[in-house]
Design a protein with these regions (language model features):
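N-terminal presequence-like segments and the immediate start of the first folded domain
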Residues: 1-35, 74-78, 95-108
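Short, solvent-exposed loop/turn elements at beta->coil junctions and helix N-caps
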Residues: 10-12, 85-90
């Protein structure tokens, strides 16, 4: 899976593929206490984008995607389709990301 095919469509359009099953990647990052406190104050007084949280989410999504791809590679996959992202909250001040989909490979 060196050329990663990652798509969000529910049905992969190409014929000649075989589903390999469900794959996922998870990530959980904690915010820095001081940055978290500053972001909370800024959110209630100034407004605007909370760059610390945006960066946290970006890092979490990237990490979850990499782990999902690793799990797909372990199955011998050429890609993953029906990719979705969930962001459950398991801890305050943390970014939790689950990225999941269906691994597939091309068959001759």
């Amino acid at each position: 899976m060196s050329d990663q095919i990652i798509v969000s469509t529910r049905a992969f359009p190409a014929s000649g593929t075989q589903d390999l099953g469900f794959v996922y990647g998870t990530s959980c990052f904690s915010a820095n206490f001081f940055k978290d406190t500053f972001s909370a104050i800024r959110n209630t007084t100034i407004g605007g984008e909370l760059g610390n949280y945006t960066k946290l989410m970006d890092e979490g999504i990237k990490s979850a995607k990499e782990r999902m791809i690793e799990n797909a590679k372990a199955l011998g996959a050429d890609g993953v389709y029906a990719v979705s992202i969930a962001t459950p909250q398991v801890a305050s001040g943390a970014a939790e990301i689950i990225m999941y989909g269906t691994a597939f490979k091309y068959v001759n």
